[in-house]
Amino acid sequence: MIVTGSNLLYLAPASTAQPQWDVQGLRWINQNHSPSVDDVAHYWETTATPMMAMPIGLYLWGAKTNDAKLKDAALLTASAEFITLSAVYLLKYIVNRQRPFRELNGIRKLGDAKSPSFPSAHAAGAFALATSLTLEYPKTWIRVTALLWATGIAYGRIYQGMHYPSDVLVGTFVGASTAWILHHYKKSWLNFLQHHLSLQITWTQNEQRLIFLQQLPLF
């Protein structure tokens, strides 16, 4: 391992069983870098967790304003994220692919990751969120903002040496397709949630606080 400034340059065994296009794509993105882009990539990644928590805020706001559509959109988005990340982490430990910085020479490593590489949970979760929101609210500015954000998250994972391009592509597909399927079967899925998960949230204007009632999973 070689420390270069704020980055880590890992030396690993030169041989790898990964497809050549995957390795070449990773190297091209990872090694075409600059300090300013490093900073942007780091900042962009820090938005992932708060953005993934967005459905909670949307649901609470929908409860406060009695906006049923917003609450439904929040439930669909949260469901897409949960199903996507569950599937992704199951795949990670079935495939058990090593992170590129652990098995390739000369990969710049920005950040850290302990779980297996394939597929990318960041890309999957980001596109589950972005796709779900754009399907529920198909306004141009929402589509552009959400998809640019998700693309930045996905690209950044390769740039930072955390993933091969195929990790990100498959993660993107899993996240986007899960959100699309849930949107396509929206009515059935929301009925399923209402039947199996007794959750009621009301907003009391006088006390200016949220009251959570009957938060009981009834599976």
Report the location of each language-model feature.
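Membrane-helix interface segments
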Residues: 36, 68-72, 138-142
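Membrane-embedded catalytic cores of phosphoryl/pyrophosphoryl-handling enzymes
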Residues: 105-217
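Membrane-water interface at transmembrane helix exits
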Residues: 58-62, 88-96, 134, 182-187
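Small-polar-interrupted transmembrane alpha-helices in polytopic inner-membrane proteins
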Residues: 79-93, 144-156
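N-terminal transmembrane-helix/juxtamembrane module of multi-pass inner/ER membrane proteins
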Residues: 2-57, 89-115
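Short helix-capping/hinge motifs at transmembrane helix termini and TM-loop junctions
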Residues: 64-66, 95-96, 138, 161
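Interfacial segments of alpha-helical transmembrane regions
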Residues: 62-84
